[in-house]
């Protein structure tokens, strides 16, 4: 068994290092564009970053991430997304930065004196995003149903208004050091506690942030932490030393990674804290995990080899070999025509009392395709070892 676990660990390392291999020969494309808006009565400048694989995968749709304050926030967001997706921690995104250099206040902070919700120019900017920006990209680019909006300070508060609708047009909001308008904390708490939509909300500030912002963020954090709603995924990031202006340089990549935390492969922390203590079938755990990715991100993600190997390690460590049969069926569904289903089927047969049959299964996979981290030579090695051990 030790030999199997050693090989599994090698495979997991291999697949982790291989995440970038499909993207390392591709490059992002940036486009400067304008949208003529009837709501704003002007042309508004936008900057677009296409995913590395956009041209190479003409059938693939990508999450849309809209960056407010794009005149200074676009580069840090676009760079963070490209880096994290390059290593497979998050999916590739189509990034759109909206220039607000001279319009920040009127775009985001003109609010009703009683309800403290958008009016006049800020209501127009809201409609511009909902009725012009999103439809423009739905028509002209391949975007999925999962949309993210990100803002800082005034625009972070503005982004919160999208969560107050019954069916939000954004499924994720990244709110960095928000300058909260009056009633916003109670609005968010009330709406997020009862939302029936899948929502991911990431909030950040710092102890060295402006005092009023840090105070409001802390209060909102405490309120949202107490919400028990399976449709809401909330995380707060409170930094210790960063001031208001430095904060985005740390918060942006961490917030993006938090937004996509369910997307990344199983790591050692998840394995040690959750998988090693499972009270349900590990195959059920794995399929439920990927169903969450579908439910939250609208992404039909193929179960990674890393995650197959993590479940294999669990089976080997605990000697729960019967689970190999179900794992083989799952592998057949995810990697048809490859050696992976035969490998797991062979392990099931070998460990449940028919090594000779397992030997034939390993050898029968020789004409099938290999997968990352698992070779035909390794399966032949398993077959030869059985032949030697039992003198077949």
Question: What residue ranges belong to the model's regions?
Answer:
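Primarily recognizes the serine-hydrolase "nucleophile elbow" in alpha/beta-hydrolase
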Residues: 145-192
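Active-site machinery of serine-nucleophile hydrolases
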Residues: 71-126
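Gly/Ser-rich "nucleophile elbow"/oxyanion-hole loop immediately N-terminal to the catalytic nucleophile
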Residues: 55, 111-152
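C-terminal catalytic histidine-bearing segment of alpha/beta-hydrolase fold enzymes
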Residues: 228-292, 297-300
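A domain-start/cap signature at the N-terminus of enzymes
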Residues: 20-61, 331
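Residue-level recognition of tetratricopeptide repeat
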Residues: 313, 347-350, 381-388
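The feature captures the conserved acid-bearing segment of alpha/beta-hydrolase catalytic domains
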Residues: 181-242
């Amino acid at each position: 068994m030790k030999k199997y676990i050693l090989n599994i660990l090698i495979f997991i390392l291999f697949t982790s290092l291989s995440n970038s291999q499909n993207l390392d020969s591709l490059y992002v494309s940036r486009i400067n564009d304008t949208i003529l808006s009837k709501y704003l009565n002007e042309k508004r400048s936008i900057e677009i970053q296409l995913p590395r694989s956009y041209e190479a995968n003409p059938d693939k749709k990508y999450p849309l991430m809209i960056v407010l304050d794009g005149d200074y926030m676009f580069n840090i967001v676009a760079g963070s997304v490209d880096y994290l997706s390059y290593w497979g921690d998050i999916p590739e995104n189509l990034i759109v930065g909206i220039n607000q250099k001279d319009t920040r206040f009127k775009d985001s902070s003109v609010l009703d004196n009683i309800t403290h919700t958008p009016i006049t120019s800020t209501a127009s900017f809201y409609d511009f995003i909902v009725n012009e920006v999103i439809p423009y990209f739905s028509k002209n680019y391949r975007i999925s149903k999962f949309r993210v909006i990100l803002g800082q300070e005034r625009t972070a508060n503005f982004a919160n208004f999208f969560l107050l609708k019954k069916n939000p047009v954004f499924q994720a909001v990244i709110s960095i050091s928000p300058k909260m308008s009056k009633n916003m904390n109670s609005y968010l708490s009330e709406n997020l506690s009862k939302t029936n939509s899948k929502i991911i909300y990431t909030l950040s500030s710092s102890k060295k942030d402006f005092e009023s912002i840090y105070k409001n963020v802390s209060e909102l954090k405490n309120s949202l932490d107490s919400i028990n709603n399976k449709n809401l995924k909330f995380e707060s990031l409170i930094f210790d030393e960063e001031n208001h202006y430095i904060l985005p340089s740390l918060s942006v990549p961490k917030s993006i990674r938090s937004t996509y935390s369910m997307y990344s492969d199983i790591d050692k922390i998840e394995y040690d804290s959750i998988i090693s203590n499972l009270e349900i079938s590990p195959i059920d755990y794995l399929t439920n995990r990927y169903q969450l990715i579908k439910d939250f991100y609208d992404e039909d993600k193929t179960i990674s080899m890393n995650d197959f190997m993590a479940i294999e390690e669990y089976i080997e460590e605990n000697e729960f070999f019967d689970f190999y049969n179900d794992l083989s069926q799952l592998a057949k569904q995810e990697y048809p025509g490859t050696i992976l289903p035969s490998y797991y089927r062979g392990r099931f047969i070998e460990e449940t009392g028919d090594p000779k049959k397992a030997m034939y299964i390993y050898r029968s996979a020789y004409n099938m395709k290999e997968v990352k981290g698992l070779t035909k030579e390794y399966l032949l090695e398993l077959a030869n070892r059985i032949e030697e051990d039992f003198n077949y």
